[in-house]
Curated annotation (Swiss-Prot):
Entry EC no(s): 2.3.2.29
Keyword ATP-binding among UniProt keywords: no
UniProt keyword Acyltransferase, yes or no: yes
Species this protein is from: Methylorubrum extorquens (strain PA1) (Methylobacterium extorquens)
Record's catalysed reaction(s): N-terminal L-glutamyl-[protein] + L-leucyl-tRNA(Leu) = N-terminal L-leucyl-L-glutamyl-[protein] + tRNA(Leu) + H(+); N-terminal L-aspartyl-[protein] + L-leucyl-tRNA(Leu) = N-terminal L-leucyl-L-aspartyl-[protein] + tRNA(Leu) + H(+)
Protein name as annotated: Aspartate/glutamate leucyltransferase
Pfam families: ATE_C, ATE_N
Amino acid sequence: MTSHPRDTPQFYLTAPSPCPYLPGQEERKVFTHLVGRRARDLNEILTQGGFRRSQTIAYRPACETCRACVSVRVVVEDFAITGSQRRILQRNAELIGTPEPNRPASEQYALFRRYLDARHGDGGMVDMTVLDYAMMIEDSHVDTHLVVYRERGPDSAIHGRGVGAPVAVCLTDVLADGLSMVYSFYDPDEASRSLGTYMILDHIRRARALGLPYLYLGYWVGGSRKMDYKAKFKPQERLMPQGWVRVE
């Protein structure tokens, strides 16, 4: 087990492994533990510096020969919705997203498993057990919660919640300058609803309602079809060597 002081971040470098996004490339990551009294502050600083959170770990790519992974964040106040994105919102008008504590549930894991098997059957997460899922959701020392999307029911106007099994779920961190979508998944049988795009659009609305300037989407990877969608939310800022650069 790696030992580390509780309030002083120590950074480590992973061994090379096959890149999950670009064939023929190897990835390495630099990471640190988000623990102790300063975990929340450290997560804020590192996210603004291009890191991503996974449980109590913050990491960013540190590949030797490739710089394709670029951290992106949507400029919420200036976001310009496209016609196709507006239609996606209309298509999912009967969904209600409810913020809930970051506690795992069996119905979440059932949806998560179906999503992985259908969309990422060859990915590194495909063997995650229910315990692994619980750790992904619960294991955190930062301000985080779930947004669980369900269909609108007859009493939803009264209590503000959807009914039935979840259609989509997002684990969301709350930062001083924005929301960060840590991980999201959805019903693979509802592909025509573009639920991944819908959750991003909904989180843009949530960030705006909270008065937060950014929505952090993680890494856009040029040349990766899996990550192309992140370039469709503009204006956005991309973290370059000179700092955050606006892209219209």
